[in-house]
A protein has these predicted regions:
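Cell-envelope and extracellular/periplasmic
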Residues: 2, 102-106, 136-141
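Conserved catalytic region of serine esterases and O-acyltransferases that act on ester linkages
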Residues: 2-35, 51, 203, 226-229, ...
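Serine-esterase "nucleophile elbow" of acetyl-processing enzymes
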Residues: 3-104, 117-128
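Structural motif
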Residues: 54, 130-133, 168
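Oxyanion-hole/transition-state-stabilizing segment in secreted/luminal serine hydrolases
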Residues: 64-68, 110-150, 177
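Alpha-helical scaffolding segments of alpha/beta enzyme cores, especially the outer helices
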Residues: 150-164, 192-199
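A short helix->loop->beta-strand "cap" motif at the edges of active sites that frequently abuts
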Residues: 164-168, 206
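Substrate-gating cap/lid alpha-helix
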Residues: 179-212, 232-235
Length: 311
């Protein structure tokens, strides 16, 4: 009998025929607004590592890599996903390929829609086991009228489609916004969404990178000047946490969980708060009011599976 915790296990849905793209209609995606609709049998979170030959990252600015300017080899930024790809490549004996379809400012509808469609095409053409990481929903949650149950339905549909191909999936939770200016008010919505993420992961046998549990992210030095995106050190530690979430015990927890020296971690001053509001919060609000996005006109930095590391 197979082990239900093994990520190689297929979901409870029937896989599509060769060359056919699975859709949310034929993968048993759950509509969280309709009690009892499409409820799949409870599975378990995936915890055992695999030897992946390919990694596809989809998401928003976090997965694009803002604001990690260390060792940039693709696009404008490096980021946790690029760093994780390098770690996974080091675990793989043969050629490793990586694609990053994430675009700053994207809502979950784009991540679970067009980006997932593109990821499915890459998975279909890939040779060897493939991992797909999904980050999305954070930009939606910032909106006061965000429907968390509707977001969960979108995410569940994307996960179901990807798992139906046999690809493994790493879901990434939002961070805990406690104490953060303005976005701290979203903490309740964030907690509700994270509960959905764990439920979805349990049903489909996914890995989970739980950023809510990463207490080092409460250190302001992990965050860039905009207080939305991470510094290179923040991305480095999250990549290590992701590697550990994928079952790699070689990722020494002390390497990313141990706090930095407290004495050099001053809290922002009121003057810095005012400067942040002027240079970052104000423009962000203006984009929301005018219906624009920082990612307008942009595409992912690696839209094809590319040998990795580059260079």
């Amino acid at each position: 009998m197979s082990d239900p915790t093994t990520p190689a296990n297929q979901p409870e849905h029937q896989a599509p025929a060769a060359g056919q793209q699975p859709t949310s209609q034929d993968t048993g995606a759950t509509d969280w607004r309709v009690p009892g609709s499409g409820i799949a049998p409870l599975r378990h979170l995936a915890t055992s590592p695999r030897d992946w030959a390919n990694y596809v990252a989809i998401g928003d600015s976090f997965t694009e890599g803002m604001s990690d300017d260390e060792n940039v080899t693709a696009g404008d930024w490096s980021g946790w996903a690029d760093r994780l790809a390098t770690m996974l490549a080091n675990e793989h004996a043969g050629e490793f390929r990586y694609a990053n379809l994430a675009v700053r400012g994207r809502l979950l509808a784009d991540v679970a829609g067009p980006q997932t469609d593109a990821a499915l095409e890459l998975v279909a053409g890939a040779t060897g086991p493939t991992l797909v990481s999904i980050v999305g929903g954070g930009n939606d949650i910032l909106r006061p009228r965000a429907d968390i149950d509707a977001l969960a339905s979108q995410l569940d549909g994307a996960v179901a489609r990807l798992r139906a191909t046999g690809a493994d999936v790493l879901l990434v939770t939002p961070t805990d916004p406690v104490g953060a200016p303005i976005i701290g008010a979203t903490r309740g919505r964030v907690g509700q969404y994270i509960a959905h993420i764990f439920s979805i992961a349990g049903r489909h046998g996914c890995y989970v990178l739980n950023q809510w549990d990463l207490h080092f992210l409460k250190d302001w030095r992990m965050w860039a000047a905009d207080r939305i995106h991470m510094t290179p050190e923040g991305h480095r530690r999250v990549a290590l946490a992701g590697f550990a979430a994928l079952g790699h015990t070689e990722a020494d927890e002390g390497a990313f969980r141990h706090p930095m020296e407290f004495a050099s971690a001053p809290k922002p001053t009121w003057a810095e708060h005012r400067e942040w509001a002027r240079t970052h919060a104000g423009p962000w609000v203006k984009r929301r009011v005018t219906g624009r996005s920082s990612g307008d006109g942009r595409s992912g930095k690696l839209t094809e599976l590319t040998p990795w590391p580059m260079g």
